[in-house]
């Protein structure tokens, strides 16, 4: 059965309040790639993907799980390298970013001095142009940034 909009907003607000009550803070790094216009017919720099990048950082309170149960790993097909789950709310993301759908390929999570890359994003109960929460599965960035 479809959830009414008022019940959906109730769930969304309840989840958001839980996030605000947590002691954890994470930083999201959103990487923007500036397109390089080749000056010649073929440019090795543009081809290889060595375009200049800029990063913007946003800090949020978040729920963070350091251990992932085997059942969750099986359900979502997560590799063993995935070592954490971050939960955020669209009520945090939309005011800061203007959207809540994150590009996993251009977003990194900074938590407790570690840089983590996103392996998978699940939008929890996506209804009415929003969702209750954003579940982000992360793994350590072995490339170092």
Where are these regions (language model features)?
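Short, conserved turn/kink motifs that form compact alpha/beta structural patches or helix kinks used as
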Residues: 1-8, 24-145
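Intrinsically disordered, non-coiled, low-complexity regulatory regions enriched in serine, threonine
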Residues: 12-16
């Amino acid at each position: 059965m479809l959830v009414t909009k008022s019940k959906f907003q109730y769930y969304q607000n309840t989840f958001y309040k839980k996030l605000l009550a947590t002691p954890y803070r994470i930083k999201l790094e959103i990487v923007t790639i500036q397109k390089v216009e080749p000056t010649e017919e073929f440019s090795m720099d543009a081809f290889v993907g060595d375009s200049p990048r800029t990063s913007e950082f946003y800090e949020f309170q978040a729920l963070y799980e350091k251990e992932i149960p085997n059942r969750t790993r099986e359900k979502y097909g997560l590799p063993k390298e995935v070592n954490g789950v971050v939960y955020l709310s669209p009520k945090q993301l939309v005011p800061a970013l203007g959207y809540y759908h994150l590009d996993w390929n251009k977003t990194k999570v900074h938590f407790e001095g570690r840089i983590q890359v996103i392996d998978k994003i699940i939008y929890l109960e996506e209804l009415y142009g929003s969702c209750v929460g954003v579940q982000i599965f992360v793994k350590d960035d072995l490339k170092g940034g």
